[in-house]
Amino acid sequence: MSLLSALTSISKPMNTSSKSSVSSKNASGLSMGSNSIACGSCGGGSYGYPGAGLLAIVDVNVNIDIDINLSATRSYSCGCN
């Protein structure tokens, strides 16, 4: 399974409807958006997976940005704006 198809299936939970879009941002990035992911009652948040040089961020607008990142930290945050 490719990274793109794995992220697409994660961004489309079975019991919700969603709109998704995929577009390239630059040579080292890809942007995906979906309105179907929620973080508690607020929706949104951020989650980083940079361990292998890859960073995935889910922001409060539920966009997933994938970029090259050499950081070794992993974090998750969720909150209301």
From Swiss-Prot:
GO biological process, one term: sorocarp development
Region (Disordered): 1-31
InterPro entries associated with the record: HssA/B-like_chaperone (IPR050533), HssA/B-related (IPR008455)
Pfam families recorded: Coiled
Biased composition (Low complexity): 9-31
Domain of life: Eukaryota
PANTHER family: HSSA/B-LIKE PROTEIN 1-RELATED-RELATED (PTHR31059), HSSA_B-LIKE PROTEIN 1-RELATED (PTHR31059:SF5)
Protein family (similarity comment): Belongs to the hssA/B family.
Name this protein carries in UniProt: HssA/B-like protein 1
Gene name in the database record: hssl1
